[in-house]
Amino acid sequence: MLSAWLRVIRVRFLLSSVIAVSVGLTINWWQTNQIDFLHALLTFGGVLVLHASVDLLNDYWDYKRGIDLQTQRTKLSGGTGVLPEGLLKPSQVYKAGVLFLVIGSLIGSYFIIIDGVIIAILLVFAVLSIYFYSTKIVDLGLAEFFVAVKGTVIVLGTYFIQSSQITTHSIMGGIAVGVLSSLVLFITSFPDHDADKAKGRRTLVIILGKKKATNVYWVFPIICYTMIGVGVAFDIFPTFCLIVFLTLPILIKCGKNLRHSFDDLTKLLPIMNSTLLYSRLTGLLFMLGFIFSGVYKLQQ
């Protein structure tokens, strides 16, 4: 039973939210040498249950719409398989998704009391977009955009809770982190193209077609690297953040291979895995850039 719940929550994908919160925290620490650890823990808790909520509700609606009955499941695409295999009841997954949404909202409500209207706006956006993600947002072709905004909002919210400010640092840092998560969603939608299209979903891969979509693969990391490169050039981010460019070889290999393997699941699987690795490593290196710089400043 526990293993089924861990599968349906997609624990391995929660790392994207951990990285987003960590980036928000480390930007603030780099600037102030301070972290409110209680608020940091509550932020981690709130963001993770909200992330779990969207994955649970997505699995529920994909099953109800019959999408997950047609996909060829892999570790990164095609749904979790928990509902088609009968490991959990649809009602259980739906109720758990709503429960996690409520818990996340309660944690967010605490920060509304402490920090005011900015957190209220971010929380309302999060709750509405999470609940309607699988039934409205994806069908409108906005899934990748939503995930990018979600990552940005997590960094913004985390930074604001710590500093009571929204700054260029948190906005640009949030965009860099958000598009990395979008890249993972984008690449994992290739194998689901036919099943998603048949059931009315509109991912970027469906809108553009698989072949044209291979060129769009580069857009996400270009935005990420541009945010960080410009940030360093204008002293918004520390020079140490340039270590993110160490992941370029992984990206280039994935992008080149995708052009010839987008319709072959066997060849696409390692590209998907490497893209996930690229996204996580780049996010972690970005976070470490602030930590290295903060430690360096303390030693001066």
Where are these regions (language model features)?
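Small-residue-rich segments of transmembrane alpha-helices in multi-pass membrane proteins
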Residues: 18-24, 146-160, 177, 206-210, ...
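Acidic (Asp/Glu-rich) catalytic motifs at the cytosolic membrane interface
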Residues: 49-74, 183-205
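Intramembrane alpha-helical segments
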Residues: 79-168
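Helix-coil boundary and interhelical linker segments in multi-pass alpha-helical membrane proteins
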Residues: 25-45, 105-120, 155-175, 227-240, ...
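Multi-pass membrane catalytic core of lipid/isoprenoid biosynthesis enzymes
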Residues: 71-112, 205-237, 277-280
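Extended hydrophobic alpha-helices typical of membrane-associated regions
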Residues: 233-298
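Topogenic membrane-insertion module of multi-pass membrane proteins
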Residues: 1-38, 42, 46, 138-145
